[in-house]
A protein has these predicted regions:
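Long, compositionally biased, intrinsically disordered regions
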Residues: 15-169
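Glycine-centered recognition micro-motifs in short, flexible terminal segments and loops
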Residues: 1-19
């Protein structure tokens, strides 16, 4: 007889949206700061004199362009995590209403996060870095839609399996 912790899954959708927003903002700012730093280093003649230095700085720039794909990977990881925890955490169908209310609150909060993303990326400092993040920009602008879809997938997975009294399934 295996017992799992019965917490989780309801708030996971909201936490995923908040963490995704945090990662997106952090990566965008990191890209902006590091790109400006590398450009400044490349224009300084005492730093960019050797070929290995130029290659190393080019490697930093190449790594920064991969941060966009990392946000997509984080989104996929959160989706898979919510599906897995929804399957492993048993839920009585009577609690579906509470889960639905939490999804609605998560969509409202994710709308605020999407609007905050749009406002933050409209600043002159971050606009140049935004062109390197097309996937992240799409995900963040459509975050309420993603949260809705992920939330309903969580409902189907958590409450769609047969319920057996006593917590055993």
């Amino acid at each position: 007889m295996m017992r799992f912790d019965k917490s989780g899954s309801v708030q996971d959708v909201l936490l995923a949206a908040i963490f995704l927003f945090g990662f997106a903002i952090a990566f965008l700012i990191t890209h902006n700061v590091m790109t400006r730093t590398v450009e400044e280093m490349l224009t300084t003649t005492t730093i960019n004199e050797s070929e290995p230095t130029v290659k190393a700085l080019g490697g930093i720039t190449e790594t920064l362009t991969r941060l966009d794909a990392l946000i997509f990977a984080v989104l996929v990881a959160f989706i898979l995590g919510i599906i897995i925890t929804g399957f492993l955490v048993g839920g009585h169908p009577i609690f579906m209403f509470i889960y639905f209310i939490v999804i609605i609150l998560s969509v409202v909060i994710s709308t605020v996060l999407a609007n905050t993303w749009e406002t933050a990326t409209a600043t002159a400092q971050l606009t140049s870095s935004l062109t390197a993040f097309p996937i992240t920009n799409f995900i963040m602008l459509k975050l309420p839609i993603f949260v809705t879809i992920i939330g309903f997938i969580g409902i189907v997975v958590m409450f769609g399996k047969p319920y057996v009294f006593g917590g055993e399934q």
